[in-house]
């Protein structure tokens, strides 16, 4: 077999990289344009639009690495703000599973949302039961603190949170991403009452569930938040200090 010298190989590799970069950039531009159009759509509720400035949807999608054509999950979607963002991010060739436990389902809101979005499937059970497997990415925003601290009749705790995260790990394809956003809590505060979580606690349970924490973002950081108020307090609502992790399933 003839050998290829480095003098021959390096220009070929450079050419391939130079061709790939404009294609990737064009795809990114198309996704951003699609997101901006969806966020500004007349049919989108005003209350959803009002959240955009503080939640930074485009920056979040880019940080998590969600791509056109991906299959993704909005885990514990509540009213579906992130479901709509992810729907636009993956485009018509992608799919979004919008998961809510039964007690969180807002049927009228959910029906209206899914009627507008053609690539969304509602899930009211576990991801495994719904057949959501080998997905590219899962996003759960402002939920992990409740799993950890306990909610309704769920006691919470580290073990329960690791089990929850392991169920997400199982639904992801090898190399898939879990995006986590939550309100920052600090030691010495009643974070259960405040609906907050210490970032290190989130790191610990993610690692114990098998994930690698690939990156952290400060795009949702708010230094004016002193972490002592409940997240719905008018003085901090929509302006809480939040952590954002991109965790990856190895493979």
Where are the regions a protein language model picked out?
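Class I SAM-dependent methyltransferase Rossmann-like catalytic core
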Residues: 31-63, 67
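Conserved class I S-adenosyl-L-methionine
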Residues: 68-78, 105-107, 152, 176-203
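Short glycine-dipeptide loop
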Residues: 68-69, 92-93, 172-178
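A short glycine-rich, Lys/Arg-flanked "PGG" loop and its adjoining helix->strand segment in the class I
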Residues: 87-88, 155-174
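S-adenosyl-L-methionine
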Residues: 105-132
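A short acidic, Gly/Pro-enriched loop at the edge of an enzyme's catalytic core
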Residues: 128-138, 142
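Core SAM-dependent methyltransferase catalytic element
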Residues: 209, 226-251
């Amino acid at each position: 077999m003839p050998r290829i010298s480095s003098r021959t190989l390096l220009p070929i590799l450079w050419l391939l990289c130079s061709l790939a970069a404009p294609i990737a950039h064009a795809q990114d531009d198309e996704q951003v344009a699609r997101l901006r159009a969806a966020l500004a759509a007349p049919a989108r509720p005003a209350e959803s639009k009002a959240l955009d400035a503080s939640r930074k949807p485009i920056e979040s999608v880019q940080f998590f690495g969600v791509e056109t054509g991906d299959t993704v999950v909005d885990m514990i979607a509540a009213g579906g703000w992130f479901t709509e963002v992810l729907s636009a991010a993956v485009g018509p060739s992608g799919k979004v599973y919008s998961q809510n436990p039964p007690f969180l389902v807002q049927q009228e809101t959910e029906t209206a949302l899914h009627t507008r979005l053609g690539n969304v499937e509602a899930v009211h059970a576990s991801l495994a039961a719904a057949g959501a497997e080998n997905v590219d990415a899962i996003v759960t925003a402002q939920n992990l603190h409740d799993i950890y601290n306990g909610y309704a009749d769920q006691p919470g705790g580290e073990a329960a949170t690791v089990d929850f995260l392991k169920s997400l790990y199982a639904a992801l394809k090898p190399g898939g991403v879990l995006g986590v956003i939550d309100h920052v809590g600090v030691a010495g505060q009643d974070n259960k009452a405040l609906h907050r979580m210490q970032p290190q606690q989130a790191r610990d349970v993610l690692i114990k569930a098998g994930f690698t924490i690939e990156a952290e973002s400060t795009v949702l950081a708010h230094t004016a938040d002193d972490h002592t108020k409940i997240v719905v307090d008018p003085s901090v609502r929509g302006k809480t200090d939040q952590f954002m992790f991109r965790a990856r399933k190895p493979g």
